[in-house]
């Protein structure tokens, strides 16, 4: 194993760990502040990602797709909170888990129905595709 490969794998693990930390911090924050177990907040992450890929495929603009990603995830999150999640605030935690797990299944199937079962790709601008010290780890993953 070369030193470059070792550093690449270390950076991949660090990036993946940060992503897991952010998602688990969101779950902990929602439960700690609101007393609500919302397992479906990762589905909003997925909706944002698919809306970004679809916007990029249509307009071919990374920055517009980034804006669409945040906007779409925020709008869907607000609608879900006002229509479904608010009714769960005074309910038992088991009810919260069941409903939010049902939301995961619903959003997963909705995305599969709209976009299909194949992955979508997004070209990243060269600004975020720089290499670090002769290592092929993209800057966007470190950021």
Task: Show where each model-derived region lies.
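Single transmembrane alpha-helix segments in multi-pass membrane proteins
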Residues: 6-55, 83-95
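Short, Lys/Arg-rich, polar N-terminal cytosolic tail immediately upstream
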Residues: 1-2
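Structural signal for alpha-helical transmembrane segments and their membrane-water exit/capping regions
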Residues: 31-36, 70, 110-119
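Alpha-helical transmembrane segments within multi-pass membrane transporters and channels
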Residues: 60-104, 110
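Extracellular/periplasmic helix-loop junction at the C-terminal end of a transmembrane helix
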Residues: 98, 105-132
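Ser/Thr-centric signal marking residues that sit
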Residues: 28, 100, 139-140
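Alpha-helical transmembrane segments of polytopic integral membrane proteins
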Residues: 23-33, 52, 76-77, 81-82, ...
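Single conserved hydrophobic/aromatic residue that forms the stacking wall/gate
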Residues: 133-143
